[in-house]
Amino acid sequence: AIIEQLPTGIFFTEKKPVIGMVHLRPLPGSPLYDPKTMDMKKIISMALEEAKILQDAGVDGVQVENMWDIPYSKGSKISHETTAALAIGLNEVIHHVTIPVGVECHMNGAEAALACAVAGGAKWVRVFEWCNAFISQSGYIDAIGGEVSRMRSRLRAEQTVCFLCDVNVKHGSHFIIHDRSVEEQAMDVEAQGGDAVIVTGFDTGTPPTVDRVQSCKNKIELPIILGSGVSTANAKELLMHADGAIVGSWFKEDNNWKNPVNFQRTRDFMKAVEELRGELK
């Protein structure tokens, strides 16, 4: 299975699609929000600038998220103002670029993200914990697949929005399910109706091992997406075993997610991916 075959509205013209990240600056309601130095107008302006750089550098899609809203609220505790601001930022990005756009709302705010996606026209939602559970920096995170899949049905969005679901996601403790392998968790996502599986390393900037990616690939038919640590140096090796990648830190100056997107870093990465695509033809 390859991601462009998903019957859920995503459309990428190339194999091994690469999704770049647009990290919205602190949104209204979050502790770091400062309307004097970074109001919504400036937040949107910066997001549009970075989305355009990513598109011009050759990425196949972008994902918008509220990464700066630390410390994160969880699930149903995510505030209305966060959802509203994320929806506005997402909608602006969607209308500013011609490539597909997705969304994530921290922490595991898949219902808020789905509401934004349906309202604005995003093609996918990243879900940190579709099934099973883990301990995040925000505390215990429970599975949300049952609730958000029913919400998608109520909104008649089965053919327009898909769920990209992490397994053994970065930045968390998975001791409570340590007797379940990553491969078994990937099989759970497939059995429980997820549309794709995201495989990560331990934290942002750390890649998954080739063995982890390939072992998941061997067990399921869903697309496998790399979710952390992909760089110009390892992109070809890892993407040989995966169907796509979400790249955040590597496209930023000094490999730091808090810094601006850098065109040349992104372009160099995409050249490596384009070489791989040529070799696979």
Where is each model-derived feature located?
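Short boundary motifs at domain starts and secondary-structure transition points
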Residues: 8-12, 153
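A general marker of short, structured functional hotspots
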Residues: 7-8, 265
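Short gly/ser/thr-rich secondary-structure transition/capping motifs
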Residues: 2-3, 226-228
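A short, charged/proline- and glycine-enriched loop
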Residues: 14-17
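Eukaryotic N-terminal low-complexity, Ser/Thr- and Lys/Arg-rich leader segments
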Residues: 1-7, 280-281
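Alpha/beta enzyme core
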Residues: 19, 24-76, 81-101, 108-222, ...
